[in-house]
């Protein structure tokens, strides 16, 4: 199934500008053709093209599925962006394929990347959403500081490499219902101050297995653990 990204206005569907060229010039869609599209809010629609040009594709539509490709869980990953952007991009793509609700980039004491432009990540997320046949787009927040993130939290998990008592993330979520949030630190790990602050806020220290993982690998393991639970 070929999916397009569109929006609904005045009871008609319209394709976003970045989709028009592929629809009209590459796939040669024209008036009378039928396409499938998502708006990013969850549903799958079928659109019937009534107007097609290099500037606009629009028509009437019908709802096909209310929660298209959506999973029955809510997962937030708060992650320190990797120094190399291709690693962060890889994580976003794979996490979207397996099902993630939101990604919150956080700036930590040991962060190597301190500036993040979300535009490229949003494009990758959209492409992965369409490729993996999902109706809801992942939310990617602007980069915020560790303190800004932690102040609004009273529960969740923090995965770190420091010695000390930690629970298994897999075991902790085995019977958990409701939204899940996990924090993944930079290559240099969270600082002692950050770990202690998180614990004081009620965030549980967890491990993701015996291996020491790179940031993007650890984040994806967390996503895969929840994905596997719901298969």
Model regions: which residues?
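Short amphipathic alpha-helix with an adjacent loop that forms part of the alpha/beta core around
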Residues: 149-152, 169-175
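N-terminal positively charged helical leader segments and presequences
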Residues: 1-67, 119
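Structured adenosyl-cofactor binding patch, chiefly the S-adenosyl-L-methionine
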Residues: 192-231
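A C-terminal functional module that forms or caps the active site or interfaces directly
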Residues: 180-197
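Short, acidic/turn-prone active-site loops that include or flank metal/cofactor-
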Residues: 164, 187-188, 210-213
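RNA substrate-binding interface of SAM-dependent RNA methyltransferases
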Residues: 68-157
